[in-house]
Every structure is written in structure tokens, then in C-alpha cells.
Amino acid sequence: MAKMRSLCAPASGDYRLTMRIALFQPEIAGNVGAVMRLGACFGVAVDLVEPMGFAWDDKRVRRSAMDYIDHVEVQRHAGFDAFRSTIGDARIVLMTTKAAASLYDFAFRADDVLLFGMEGAGVPAAVADAADAAIKIPLRPQVRSFNLATSAAIALGEALRQTGTLP
């Protein structure tokens, strides 16, 4: 099993070149592992904004990420401000059930950072206010939300399709 790394630097050394997925204080290790696998498959880096609701060396992350962990760039940040300081002028696009606009009506850019909140609570108001845009995945009114990793896959797939950057 590969060792889990805190930071896997891109070959260019520049984290602002391409789209990224950011998870704000994720609570479930399996979701983080699944998003890391998603990042590996699509060639998109993953940012983890701490604190997380589990130990970084949690076996559940490894089990979900499998050997894909060696194929994804992962950067951990001590908090939201630390995260923001690393993304330069990239636009933060918050994925939230509270948004009015649909991701299918939104114009993504190739260097957007797709931000996802905590599984149980989303993001605090200050983080939502700091986002450049807030959008949602439309779903039936009888249900609350998708799983975090499922949401990331839907949103990232649409964003990459729109920007012509699918692998």
C-alpha cells in the first residue's frame, strides 16, 4: 500500500494552472478517498481544508483511494485562509444546496476551484461569502443532497466538459 502524502506537487510546481477540487473540513474518510480517486482519473488536484473529521492516515481513505493515491496531487491546508492564499486569482465556485443557480446554467473556467462543504453542514457563512460564485446540482425536492463524492463527480464532469478539458 502506498504511503499517504501530505502534498504531491505538480510537475510544473504551480497549483493555479488547472481546475481543482477543494473539500472544506471533510468529515468522512471514504469520501475523501473517493474524491482523490476522481482527481486522479480526471487529472485534477485536490485541496483539503482542515480540520478534517478523521486522522489523515485513516485506512478508509486508503481503501477508497486505492493505488490512485499515487496519481493525484493533494494539498492539505491548515484552514480556509491558508487555502485561499495558495490559489491566486482562481475563482472559487461553491457547490451548495442553498444556491439558486444550477451548475448547468453556469459558465465554468478552466482554472476554477470547485469548493465542497462538510457532509453534514456545508460551509459557514464567512466561507460562502468568500466564494466568487455559488451553484447547485438540481435534484428532486423530496431529497436533500447527493453524497459528497457523487456531487464532486457530477460537478467536475460538467465543468471539465464545458471547458474542453476532459482527459
Region spans (language model):
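Post-transcriptional modification and biogenesis factors for structured RNAs
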Residues: M1-P167
